[in-house]
From Swiss-Prot:
Homodimer. Gene3D superfamilies: Nucleoid-associated protein YbaB-like domain. It comes from Bacillus cereus (strain ATCC 14579 / DSM 31 / CCUG 7414 / JCM 2152 / NBRC 15305 / NCIMB 9373 / NCTC 2599 / NRRL B-3711). InterPro entries: YbaB-like_sf, YbaB/EbfC. It is found in: Cytoplasm, Nucleoid. Keywords: Cytoplasm, DNA-binding. HAMAP family: DNA_YbaB_EbfC (MF_00274). GO terms for cellular component: bacterial nucleoid; cytosol. This is Nucleoid-associated protein BC_0025. Belongs to the YbaB/EbfC family. GO terms for molecular function: DNA binding. Binds to DNA and alters its conformation. May be involved in regulation of gene expression, nucleoid organization and DNA protection. The keyword Electron transport does not apply.
Length: 109
């Protein structure tokens, strides 16, 4: 009886190690995936990776109005928030498959 218990424990440890390895790989892949946030009908584009790092900001020339810098700032902010929201969604969908059923506090995948 003791022997079966140890076998189950070893099996569980192997499963945990595999899950840990798979999670590390998924985290690494998140850094390679990108999402795009936009505002102003595509006049502003912000590109972020799955680690929520902003990689690029594109501003179309016609949206730049020296008389209305505030509008440009608002559009950049909106596009950035859109990109970060999409990065969150990407992270949650990627990492969520590992934490399904673990009852982690909200916002943790």
């Amino acid at each position: 009886m003791m022997r079966g218990g140890m076998g189950n424990m070893n099996n569980m440890m192997k499963q945990m190690q595999k899950m840990q390895k798979d999670m590390a790989k998924a985290q690494e892949e998140l850094g390679e995936k990108t999402v795009e946030g936009t505002a102003g009908g595509g006049m502003i584009t912000v590109i972020a990776n799955g680690h929520k790092q902003i990689l690029e900001v594109k501003i179309k020339e016609e949206v730049v109005d020296p008389e209305d810098i505030e509008m440009l700032q608002d559009l950049v902010l909106a596009a950035t928030n859109d990109a970060l929201k999409k990065a969150d969604e990407l992270s949650n969908s990627t990492m969520g498959k590992f934490t399904k059923g673990l009852n982690l506090p909200g916002g943790m995948f």
